[in-house]
Amino acid sequence: MELLAKTRKLNALLQSAAGKPVNFREMSDTMCEVIEANVFVVSRRGKLLGYAIHQQIENERMKQMLAERQFPEEYTQNLFNVTETSSNLDVNSEYTAFPVENKDLFGQGLTTIVPIVGGGERLGTLVLARLGREFLDDDLILAEYSATVVGMEILREKAEEIEEEARSKAVVQMAISSLSYSELEAIEHIFEELNGTEGLLVASKIADRVGITRSVIVNALRKLESAGVIESRSLGMKGTYIKVLNDKFLHELAKLKTN
């Protein structure tokens, strides 16, 4: 397969995603096919975002690593020393993707390391490995192109996470601001007693202890529930089951108490 055909194969994968998140496993499979090498997409913390195996490596440690989808911490940290594409590293290199305890079996093993960079920061590493055949310029062009695509995808996911976090925080702040002074006081006492993200409580007991009416507690819970911040369910004489749905809620509530 010529370079242009291989590039088109990678492009076809991106175009088929059509604005949806690129599946790192599918991306790895395609890279594995066009570059003809074992492919590992490694995050900053060593998490295996995606991988594909072209040549099986019979080694228990490697199998466990793939099963856990996690690269060793020391190896991951060492990868940060590689700031530009380093190709055809042999089994004696500290960056080899072959098991060092089996150097005699993988003497012809070659590894290529491609940093994944986006937005001016290191986002991860693309690790390629194969036996007996050097990585040529065409392979490196495809690898660097793939690393750029992966970097853009990681940045997109990070932006979505930040956006979702901001949205969750805004929902909580709006829900809390909709509470009256007595309702806010009731909510503070409820979650002080709950002491966690879910549990069972008796509203009448809290109302008596704090000196507010039960209707204030009911209204406060209803407001938070309609905002999607909590879930509440009456269990009759047993009390009310409450579960926090928005993980920003308790933090924002705690901030109010300290201010």
From Swiss-Prot:
Subcellular location: Cytoplasm
GO terms under cellular component: cytoplasm
DNA-binding region of this protein: 203-222
GO molecular function, one term: DNA-binding transcription factor activity
Keyword Translocase: no
Function: DNA-binding global transcriptional regulator which is involved in the adaptive response to starvation and acts by directly or indirectly controlling the expression of numerous genes in response to nutrient availability. During rapid exponential growth, CodY is highly active and represses genes whose products allow adaptation to nutrient depletion.
Family from the record: Belongs to the CodY family.
Entry protein name: Global transcriptional regulator CodY
Species annotation: Bacillus cytotoxicus (strain DSM 22905 / CIP 110041 / 391-98 / NVH 391-98)
Gene that this polypeptide is encoded by: codY
